[in-house]
Amino acid sequence: MFANPVVKSFQYGNHTVTLETGVIARQATAAVMASMDDTSVFVSVVAKKEAVPGQDFFPLTVNYQERTYAAGKIPGGFFKREGRPSEAETLTARLIDRPIRPLFPDAFKNEVQVIATVVSINPEVNPDMITMIGTSAALAIAGIPFNGPIGAARVGHINGELVLNPSNTELENSKLDLVVSGTEGAVLMVESEADNLTEEEMLSAVVFGHEQQQVVINAINEFAAEVATPAWDWVAPEENTVLNARIAELAEAKLVEAYQITEKMTRYDRIHEIAAEVNEVLVSENEDVNLKEVHTIFHDLEKTVVRRSIIAGNPRIDGREKDMVRALDVRTGVLPRTHGSSLFTRGETQALVTATLGTQRDAQIIDSLMGEKKDHFLLHYNFPPYCVGETGFVGSPKRREIGHGKLAKRGIQAVMPSIEEFPYTVRVVSEITESNGSSSMASVCGTSLALMDAGVPIKASVAGIAMGLVKEGDDFVVLSDILGDEDHLGDMDFKVAGTNEGITALQMDIKIEGITKEIMQIALNQAQGARKHILKVMDEAISGAREEISEFAPRIHTMKISSDKIKDVIGKGGAVIRALCEETGTTIEIEDDGTIKIAATEGAAAKEAIRRIEEITAEVEVGKIYTGKVMRIVDFGAFVTVLGPKEGLVHISQIAEERIEKVADHLQVGQEVKTKVLEIDRQGRIRLSIKEANAELNPAPAAEAKDAE
């Protein structure tokens, strides 16, 4: 039934990788089942044979989805099925998209959709690497124009050694989590989180990962040769040299002048005017001119003008030299009621960042295929349309916002205190209020400042910088602190975050081949100088965490009780702890080892909660007098509380000196009385006496007189 199934297996580090096609999803343009040990991902590629007429962009979509059946689970929630992509799924989709997008020809505008579905999971093998490998293999056998294949590798740094594709357990002890992807001859994408590694160590890891993934690239080439899919009969449309020359004649000199304007919005207005003038002239010359084609050529001309100027050694768009950082303005404590806040401005990029402290109950529970975990540090990045002077839809975060937030979090994670050192859940929100390049790195700087303002004892200040590259032939220029235009028109986006000691995060997206190790070394060294300059300015504003957290933040007080007393503090059905929280206005969390954390905005409330817990957990002593409340009245006596919720029985004979007929004549429910503990039997039942407590506290006058005689 299955005509030509093709299977390719190879060893990749400590893992066995298998690529298989020809059995599943045979109506797709290409489909591959990719496995790394017991982690399997099914990848399909569908490409439309024709592009939409007049379409001026490349509609590539990458969908990554994790199925819970892969881990032998049933989804939680009411609907019992997978819903919208999680944050982790979105980040993995971006990880796949970034290295493959630049490998499609610029003129190829046919719609392409990649769908990757995790169908089996080994908790020790993260599915992202095999997904990237499977995607590369599927594109390689699809027959569509694609300048691949790519490889992918995860690199760890454990005990001073670089480790290829470490397991999830090994990653827990690694100072580095780096993903690198590229073709046979070039690195295209790097995504990493590090614990203050040096520039040399980071570069070595990138080179190591690229060298190791050559095994993958060779295997995919052999796999594609065996499948032998015919290549599409697609030829890039011929360049319209006449229109190119006419637009250059009309606009080139004006664009050179426009790019001397240093203020972003004024420059944009002038460029739009030039574009409108060009359109007007061309339409007057030919009513049938394709304005979308004109727009594309005009944009390419802009790119040429800017790149030529930079390569020639001229000042950049905003007048800076290649290694200059824009003017900085750093402020902390800008919002009165937040727990911590900062306003970080770098040129025309600005981030308003807040830090909020919560209890461990506020931690985010992440239920992934590889198990459940709690995240006590949250960082959310928002990019509203007004930050670039535009109108637009405001709603749930887009892929870009999720990706930028994750990058900023990676940059800060290495300096965050452990939950034992600082028992708070911390949420940071970065609102980008102005943007002209490098807003994610502004978020890193703003986050570091806001955390210190909130009193979070981070280990060191962290700053981030975005680097760019313009390369023409053998000539190249590395740019520090790139503008949005330089990012868009350049060949590389290279973001580095770190402390004065080393790098904490590195993200790199390269649009061209030929980026050598030497170029990356220059970029890293130049980024180090820029990072240290920013850190110096930040340290002048605030150089360490404030000694006291905000008066509006909850104070967390920790106490320890015996684990066998936990049930007493919780009470039947949680009644005791619920009453404690409500009556004292605190939040109380109890751990299995007996550690209790009490969160309160007022010290008096915390003290009262501690007093009551101590009372509940204290041992009742025979012969001691306690104050309690009458809880129930029965014919033979009354039940009275001792040390919080504990109850003891006051027999009717122990209520008063004289004989009484009815308990209700002497006691009422809710009445506060003092009792003396007479006995605690083997079953823990407590026998109390009001009579003896009164006798001890208020000796009779007759007895006193007798003693005097």
Swiss-Prot record:
Q: Which domain of life is it from?
A: Bacteria
Q: Which cysteines are joined by disulfide bonds?
A: none
Q: Which UniProt keywords apply?
A: Cytoplasm, Magnesium, Metal-binding, Nucleotidyltransferase, RNA-binding, Transferase
Q: Which reaction does it catalyse?
A: RNA(n+1) + phosphate = RNA(n) + a ribonucleoside 5'-diphosphate
Instruction: Please cite one Gene Ontology biological process associated with this protein.
Output: RNA processing
Q: What is its EC number?
A: 2.7.7.8
Q: Give cofactor(s), names only.
A: Mg(2+)
Residue ranges of domain KH in the record? 554-613
Q: Which residues bind Mg(2+)?
A: 487, 493
* S1 motif domain residues: 623-691
Got a GO cellular component term for this one?
A: cytosol
The UniProt entry, under InterPro entries, shows: ExoRNase_PH_dom1, ExoRNase_PH_dom2, ExoRNase_PH_dom2_sf, KH_dom, KH_dom_type_1, KH_dom_type_1_sf, NA-bd_OB-fold, PNPase
Which compartments does it reside in? Cytoplasm
Identify its protein family: Belongs to the polyribonucleotide nucleotidyltransferase family.
**NCBIfam families referenced in this protein's UniProt entry, alphabetically:** polynuc_phos, PRK11824.1
Kindly provide the name given to this protein in its UniProt entry: Polyribonucleotide nucleotidyltransferase
* Gene label: pnp
